[in-house]
Amino acid sequence: MNELVYGLSALGISLNSVQLGQFETYYQELVDYNSRINLTAITEYKDVQIKHFLDSVSLVLAGIKGDEKLLDVGSGAGFPGLPLKILFPAIQLGLLEATQKKARFLSEITVKLGLSGVEIISQRAEDTAQNPLYRQKYSLVTSRAVADMATLAELTLPFCAVGGRVIAPKKGDIEEEMDRAATAVKKMGGRVFKVIKVELPGLEDGRKLVLLEKISNTPALYPRRAGIPAKTPLI
């Protein structure tokens, strides 16, 4: 895990032997499972360390507390939620993943990593956000899902408690995308707090973290029915 260790050193973070072992296990299980179902196109050891593990942990630049109640929306193979859980074991983590095969991987890898305080939720975000067990219950919501910011705002902010935050990693020039998302962010009860540049070893490709803050309750009609936020963003 030399690439990951080096990248984390730029953040002033060091891993203990247990955490290093967990990341090694995560890599091995990811590659093994990926041979059976498509979890990721990134499988080389160095690339996984940088583009999955370090990229996930880079969210600490936006300010993450060790006792967050965190929901990772569209978690896929567990990024960024599981690397953050390894780094901060006291986090109460929810992994929201609608695809059953990916959710099964998340359940299995959580056990193999010896993690507690992790809930796998295999449902659509639009449906889950209307469930009072999950609606406005999280201090932090993350999503690395490839989606327009207007769509992401509708799929993430309803999970945030007032005073909570959304961290959404993005790449490239996002000024126009953020302008389009302004209506959705406001309607969900949020505001754009800041955009943070990510400059870490191996991640010098224009990565940014969009930080949204929840300032008021999300109206009951949001999010809209499954599929609509992606097909018809609120712009």
Curated annotation (Swiss-Prot):
* Tagged with keyword rRNA processing: yes
- What does the record give as EC number? 2.1.1.-
Question: What GO molecular function annotation could you give as one example from this UniProt entry?
Answer: rRNA (guanine-N7-)-methyltransferase activity
**One protein family per Pfam:** GidB
Q: Which residues bind S-adenosyl-L-methionine?
A: G74, F79, E97, A98, T99, A125, E126, R144
Which compartments does it reside in?
Answer: Cytoplasm
Q: Name one GO cellular component term.
A: cytosol
Keyword presence, Amino-acid biosynthesis: no
* Annotated keywords: Cytoplasm, Methyltransferase, rRNA processing, S-adenosyl-L-methionine, Transferase
* NCBIfam families linked: rsmG_gidB (TIGR00138)
Q: What does this protein do?
A: Specifically methylates the N7 position of a guanine in 16S rRNA.
- Family indicated by similarity: Belongs to the methyltransferase superfamily. RNA methyltransferase RsmG family.
Name of the protein: Ribosomal RNA small subunit methyltransferase G
**Species in which this protein is naturally found:** Dehalococcoides mccartyi (strain CBDB1)
